[in-house]
Amino acid sequence: MAKEALIVKTTPLPQSRISFELEIPSETCKTCVNETISTISRSAKIPGFRLGKIPKQVLIQRIGITQLHASALEKIIDKSWQEALKIKSIEPLSEPELVDGFESLLAKFSPEKSLKFTLQTDVAPELKLKKSKGLSVEISKTKFDPKSVDEALEKSRSQFANIIPVTNRAAKLGDIAVVSFKGKYKDSGKEIDGGTSESMDLELEKNKMIPGFVEGIVKMKIGDTKTLNLKFPEDYSHEDSRGKEAIFEVSLKDLKEKELPELNDDFAKQSGNKESLKELKKDIEKQLKENFEKTQKDIKIEALLDALTNELVAEIPKSMIDIEVRNNIEQTAQRFAQQGLDVKSTFTPELVKSLSESTRPQAEKNVQRNLALKALAEKENITVEKDEIDLKMKDYEDAISQSSKQIDIKKLTEVISKDLLKEKLIIWLEENSEVKEKTTKASQASKTTKAKKTTTKTTKATKTATKTTKATKTQNKKEKK
């Protein structure tokens, strides 16, 4: 008599989910229960019986039939799920969800009868582009501002400044104030998490801390204590504080100022290893222009990718966004670990939750873009050839040979292939789209800010994590003192 086969019926569901209706033959159920009993028997210890020689009925009486059936059922679900995926040639994106629940299925399970149950999972969405050629975008064409060179020089002067104590005047913008502060919410009186410090060096510059904090310290003298009534911004990184009013008790413990070096040839040698100030300015201008041109190109690419994404038709499953969020958090943690920071103490459950929430919009955008590019590659038959990958691999030969760590060549090849494909797709977009430029005047500083908002991969989550790390460092300094 032929062995009964697993029966599999699939039904597509909204949001790129698929339902698997499985029917397990009674013979399979009975075999799995017997195998479970045999496995447990080999390791179970019952007084009066040798190991592996416990009678079936004694084992059932000792372990309990429900527990044995539960163990067998877990194996049945797992094995049938793997077999169903092979039968239907489907690659799931998420773990299967048992529709009726495990306890309900266990209650009706019998080794003598066939078993029916339904599993659901996410799968890769079907992709369609309404349009790929002839996309039209408009970007602001800003001109390079020569004043940015002077701004960069001033920042460099500030970095190489001598810090000297101030005793005979009040605090002003540009000073370095050593402050202690304690913050609480105005409505509840509850202390603000991370809103307390016994000693912190704070550069008195606008846009540092929350609005009004720096301005409140200006005109204070050493030894002064002041109460600041402030309000957290609506877009503050910590969701619990957004829009809330707060009271800060601030004391000015010490005051310092920066003594800026003169802009001359000596400064050029000290700050940029250049022979003259003229040479230093020329070098700074070259770097700024290169960065400016790259920023302009990035802005154009961002606009084209947004336009392409708007043409995408796809039901994106939640699990794809979840995976992207998790990957972003893991990458952030890896960067922190590479900097020698204690990831376990920094990435608390509260922070991970905050990161998950704050990175989600960007993660969703990343997934949409990647799918739009994938759809473009399929529609226009854009691929990467093996010789292109091999040629690019040569750039990594020295790094691979000199690395003390084992390099996963297969993974590296996949990364190179993805990067090359993305480059090809972006070039194709540039060649087959219309980009209109609108000339505007803006300072280099505002252009840099805009570029960062448009092109940076650093999310609010990373900023939140960075702030947490700084707070941790400050706390560690206090403890050492």
Swiss-Prot record:
It comes from the Bacteria. Residues 435-481 are annotated as: Disordered. It is found in: Cytoplasm. Keywords: Cell cycle, Cell division, Chaperone, Cytoplasm, Isomerase, Rotamase. Residues 174-261 form the PPIase FKBP-type domain. InterPro entries: PPIase_dom_sf, PPIase_FKBP_dom, Trig_fac, Trigger_fac_C, Trigger_fac_C_sf, Trigger_fac_ribosome-bd_bac, Trigger_fac_ribosome-bd_sf, Trigger_fact/SurA_dom_sf. GO terms for cellular component: cytoplasm. Disulfide bonds: none annotated. Involved in protein export. Acts as a chaperone by maintaining the newly synthesized protein in an open conformation. Functions as a peptidyl-prolyl cis-trans isomerase. Belongs to the FKBP-type PPIase family. Tig subfamily. Consists of 3 domains; the N-terminus binds the ribosome, the middle domain has PPIase activity, while the C-terminus has intrinsic chaperone activity on its own. This is Trigger factor. The lineage of its organism: Bacteria, Bacillati, Cyanobacteriota, Cyanophyceae, Synechococcales.
